[in-house]
Amino acid sequence: MTSIDMKEDSIPAPRSGEEKSGRLLDVKDLHVEFHTRDGVVKAVNGVNYSVDAGETLAVLGESGSGKSVTAQAIMGILDMPPGKIPQGEILFRGQDMLKMSNEERRKVRGRKIAMIFQDALSSLNPVLSVGYQLGEMFRVHEGMGRKEAKAKAIELMDRVRIPAARERVNDYPHQFSGGMRQRIMIAMALALEPDLIIADEPTTALDVTVQAQVMDLLAELQREYNMGLILITHDLGVVADVADKIAVMYAGRIVETAPVHELYKRPAHPYTRGLLDSIPRLDQKGHELYAIKGLPPNLLKIPGGCAFNPRCPKAQDVCRTEVPALVPVTEQDGAQLPGRGSACHFWKETIHG
């Protein structure tokens, strides 16, 4: 494959909802490893997913599943070394970002793809005002002067509904609540009107009411700008009203894909079933809360066969010897279920049983 000759304006820069359309991102057979003194950590093992303009993909899984590492690989912010991407493609609007130079990648990051990190307090510089940090996006990428950039920062703070934005633009991160800091992170991601936003656990450590407000704000802004959104989370409750489709990850692999409401109604993988069963329900007061037994595997020593087999109630001998491929899921009569896939030898028993 020939290398791509990237020029500064080689990736289109749509700025209106009408122009932002079609396939934005294709991740193909992505592998990420970390080389440590104890051995090679296989954090991501052949991940495939895509995101279109205006679409929300939720990437779901426990800690250590590889969901955040995949996002960091897309953004180009993995520490390499010790990280390494031995194979795979990350296509943004058809062009492989893994073949770009650092300078070419920098022009995509922020302007075309932006990321919202889970811990706003540690992501923001504590000794710089939030207005300065928001304005920096415009000074660096748009060449604006400080006064004009500050005006843009106030406009963004208003847009994400931070009260008294003009008075608070000179405040520092510690002077804002957790929910307001997360709004600042959203404003920073939106600054250059990117095509795609990656939100990594954006509601972690926020109370339930603030979580809902932040997710509603993200959904509203996504519709307004027709952006693609990748929502990384371990919380099924967060994605139900926001996502269009879900990719469930376990031990570096995608084990199930489905449109969001289909997955909630009929999971096709025992791991997904376990996650759903562990959600507290108001109609089951007094019942013992289900928990998936055991712990996620050590990525230095991933079990043979299906990585979930030591914890799976349906595991049989084949599960311990053969890695299940992600295959299309169908109805009992063979009718196709669009967007559905499962990496389980016994997906039929799981979804139809």
Per-segment meaning from a language model:
Residues 89, 93-96, 148-167, 276:
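Conserved ABC ATPase "signature" region
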Residues 81-86, 97-114, 132, 140, ...:
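ABC ATPase NBD coupling module
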Residues 18-23, 163-167, 257-353:
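Short catalytic/signature loops enriched in Gly
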Residues 171-176, 180:
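Conserved ABC ATPase signature
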Residues 191-195:
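A short, proline-enriched helix->beta-strand linker immediately N-terminal to the Walker B motif
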Residues 62, 198-202, 206-287:
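P-loop NTP-binding/switch modules centered on Walker-like glycine-rich loops
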